[in-house]
């Protein structure tokens, strides 16, 4: 199948502003940012088309350590709250972004590919968090200043690590960049990674545990 991502010629940006808001996060072991799955339909023979897709390529996410009390928080443009919800399921906190048609501006209601534009989000991790999942279309995740024994993360798009020091790290992203920091044991499944690089002048890895169909 060929996926048709053509956009209309008119402006298909969804601007979300408002006064910046910060909310405290409950204790959790897994923190997942997500959006409802895309519904695909047959457009014509050999081509499938999304009913509607929302790209967060212009809403970067910074993931950092919690405050001095190791409490977690989430910061974002205030108007984003109308399109997000937080729910706890077991030891997992779900932050879901959803854009129902009745909340879309008129000029966007016929668009298939809508690009969300807003100020960057900041996620400060609660002390107990062991896994971060960013299952959001095109969202860049920048991990900064983390100090922990064990962490795993999975992002749908791009991830960068700056000044992160982790004993055991399992990482997965389409594009993965280790810019500065240290990892004693790094676990990668290369079948799930399109490209990755390590700045050897400022990032040190003791042992790489590589898996995938070629290993």
Set out the residue ranges of the language-model regions.
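Generic marker of "main functional regions" within proteins
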Residues: 38-43, 96, 161, 171, ...
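Short, surface-exposed interaction patches in beta-rich subdomains
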Residues: 164-215
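Generic low-polarity alpha-helical segments
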Residues: 24, 31-33, 71-73, 86, ...
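Right-handed parallel beta-helix
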Residues: 58-168, 176-180, 196
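Short extracytoplasmic
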Residues: 9-56
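Hydrophobic membrane-insertion alpha-helices, especially the h-region
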Residues: 1-2
